[in-house]
């Protein structure tokens, strides 16, 4: 996939001025994987861990400060490391699967995670996407690691000792280990998971060392046994030792894993088998620079550069590539849906409820060939399970709501990609829109019978989050309609989805101008508090969800009484005190994150309202979008361990920043348009995959210069509040003239408003 030889001429170097000194560096040097790691159950500042990985890698590696099975695997405030874990965790809420760890120690053999743990300091820690190093003070050992796509190489620098050991922990819930001393090798598997796997699920691993073992033992349920070298148990592990080490001498371990077999794990080991540690490091750095170098940023503020490239790094981790390459060079995958080994693509560990909003549109803009592969993976997921996933980790998970695979599929078609079965995806979309997954309510459409009959899901039929589901289903129906229309499907098939796309109107309450729960008899629920985080909504309230009409803001404006009334409703979101509604239900972390940010009812730490500031563009007051978008970027995104204002969510919250800092955002994925905001950088160059470049300049921008006074496109005045994907694809030069005062004449005409489905229907398209 990646041609390292071509990088010499293609890696883009950035010039950043800091403390009066010019520095020349590469994109990956700005990335801080520790952003967002200062989090806990009660308050998320990202809920991230340092993912040491390749872009979209099958395996990530991370230092482990939490206990075995803890979703908070690494927290910045911790002071001890218990191991270095291979992880596939997309979120602490969904937790991990197939995980195992490795840990160097000195002294006496110790397997217990508390006894083997070591103090560490961030002052003796280096975290980069392609490399991690830390000094383990209690053992006087420096651990270094660098990953490939499916393997990794470790380097342990021990003190002078005859008692150096490496612990391999295959974790509990069913694991296997075998020490093969004649080959300096350990093999094993982990079956630990948090759901979403077939019964035959295993993560097979192989570990080889560069020297013989002076000590070897297997571990059964915590007990070290020198008499056994092979154990299958609830909790298996191994300890191997090395003697006669000189101070500073390095022990190298190479590790690979496979979800298919031990034999495939051996094939995957070839990624690092014949390479030195430095070669793997250099290749990882080059690969990250190729990916991050799709965007070249020039700016005077180094913290913003760190925030940007760290956000782009987070945007290119998930969904992970779950495929493997067999001995003939063919791409295969273990199906997390039916347990079979099958040919072709598979991607996983993403929740479409989060990532349809900006993560996948970002992939379509900057990495369309990668999303092409992801679409083939969706085709395979449908073949293997009968449904498109909504939250995959690695298979179907019971998490969140919506049928937003429709958005993922429809938005990808905007790039006019080829190479996957779009007709089968059409069948998959129709099936998912008219049925419910039998095992849980998060795949397909829970409550579809009511929605299809009444045009909404009633609040009195025991389908929770009914307002949120209904609104998302309406947007999903629009996506299905647009997808079918683009494929040339007959109107007899597509018309029903165009009709259902307007179902959002059925829950609009004219008396409050908000979306409100409605009973089966057509009456609104009586106990309505718009600030209450009630059961009709998903992780939010009426203020958050009433603007979730992504495909038809003009229709929503009409319902609310026109532009002035609509703008007033938007303004109100930022005015109502953040503590309103806090006692409406048991506290969840999203509520606290909104409260402490002190931006009224605007809850950027959660997805439903993230697009809302851009809606001013539809109502002839784009300067308010510019003000709020810039304020959100400046206040809520920092290059620090507490740098997010809620869950990062597999690239979604990061992709919001990436788009917004460029100066535009995909309010309605699959519409082919981006809505203009306030560019944050002096100069940006997008290096599109087709060879074209998009140059964005905003040299007058600053802390106070947040308003767009003028915009030119290829030297000509441009007053619209939107940008079309197809126009960017041709290459473009956008020059923003920024100002401290809003220009209340620019972007105020009806034709300047971005796409709305109501306008499309009026025009008869």
Where are the regions that the model predicts?
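Bacterial Sec-dependent N-terminal signal peptides
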Residues: 1-24
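Accessory carbohydrate-recognition regions in carbohydrate-active enzymes
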Residues: 23-407, 413-471, 479, 484-506, ...
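ATP-dependent phospho-/nucleotidyl transfer catalytic cores
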Residues: 476
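Extracellular attachment/recognition segments
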Residues: 707
